[in-house]
Structures are given as C-alpha cells and as structure tokens.
Amino acid sequence: MARVLGVHCINDMPTVYASYWAERILGEARKVGHTTRELTGAMVTSAGLQSSMEQYKPDMVILAGHGGPNVFTGAGMQVVLRGCTNDGMMKGSQSMFVSCLTGLSLVPSMVSKGSLAASGFTKEFVWMIDGMGFPAADKYAASFTRFWVEASRALFQSGSWQNYYQVGKRVWAEEEAKWEQSTDPVAPSVILCIRQNSSAMVVNGAGAMEVPEGGGVFSFLPVLAIGALLYSRNK
C-alpha cells in the first residue's frame, strides 16, 4: 500500500479549514489501507519537508496551507516550496495541493523536476464560512468539505487521477444545483465560490490526458500535496 504524508499547520482562519480538510483526506487514505504520517505545526518548513521526504519516502503528499502561483507556505507563512528552486525534493512522489494558485506555476514546475503528478488550482480556492470557526459544523463550508472528501476518496479507492477529477467536477455541479434551490441569502456567494473552484482544478503529470482547463489526468502512484487557501467570511 501507499505511504501518504500530510503537511499542514494553522496560521489563521483559512488554515484552520485547510488543516481540517487535510485530516479528512488522510482519513480517506487510511480507510483503504494506506499508511499515513503528518508534518504539522512549527515543523512545516522547507527543511522539515525535505527531511520527511528523505526519511519517510512518501508516495503521496497532501499539502494544505496558503499558496501562490509559484510557492507553498507553512509555519509562520514561511516559504516551504518554491518552483524552480527547491521543488526537486518532490521527485518521484505525487502531490495534492489544498491551496490557492499553485496550479499556475508550482505544480507544472514540480512535474518538470520529476514529480509523477500534482494537482492544484489556477485561481484562488474560495469558500464561505459561518464565522464560528468550526469546519465540521459549518453549513456553508460543507459543500467544500464534500469536494475534498469525495474526490480524494475516488483517488485512493481507484488509483486514478481521472476519477479524482471527474468526481470533483460532479460534486461541484451537484452542490451548485443544491444551492441554486436555496433561499439562504448567502447562497449566491456560495455558488460563485463553487464555480470558481470548479473552473480552476488542474492535474499535471507525465502522459496526462488533457482536460478543458488545460491540466491533465492520469493513473496515480500514491502521493497527495496541499497548498494555500482564500476564504470569504459571512458577515
């Protein structure tokens, strides 16, 4: 079975949700028999990740936190991964970024340095929250939690990035349809977030099939990575 590494830390409210999603993704990995390990808190640094990659040799890396087009950040918002600089440490693994914007440059750079596959978003990953700070009970964030749970489940159960992508798109479509029927005044904002996230999904890797957004889908050797997030608070 695969070795899955979860990388996440809490710096602010968005990363509270990111860390929660990372834990849910790791839970899906364990359900099908994969082994998991976590790099959390103050250990989420460039040196910490490199040490984990060398010692644990994960097949899949889940990276959850703030990101930009060419960077993923960790403890204290310090840069953990930077494209064309230290992303070669991900060689031979696969990654899933729960993060903003990493699909623009960092994901392609990692693949060019030897990563087998990596997924991310080409826009800011956005969602609505109820302002209470408890992701598991947040009715507005539930649609976004469902995406991470069901898409990662499809990946771990089938070993196919294509299934990850297709299930993810289906979840977005179903959640959009649900919110279109809602009379909640926040519903239009939730729908806008769903549409943005759905349009920004990308998966890159050697031999990947093209998808409408320009990324790719492919069979997976185990690894998840996660990046950065943007959130919208319901006032």
Sequence positions of predicted segments:
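A domain-level signal for caspase-like cysteine endopeptidase catalytic cores
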Residues: 1-64, 96-97
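Solvent-exposed loop/turn segments at secondary-structure junctions
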Residues: 10-14, 43-46, 66-71, 100-105, ...
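A short, glycine/acidic-enriched catalytic loop
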Residues: 67-91
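Ser/Thr/Gly-rich flexible loops in soluble cytosolic domains mediating phosphotransfer, phosphorylation
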Residues: 82-107
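C-terminal membrane-anchoring or membrane-association module
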Residues: 229-235
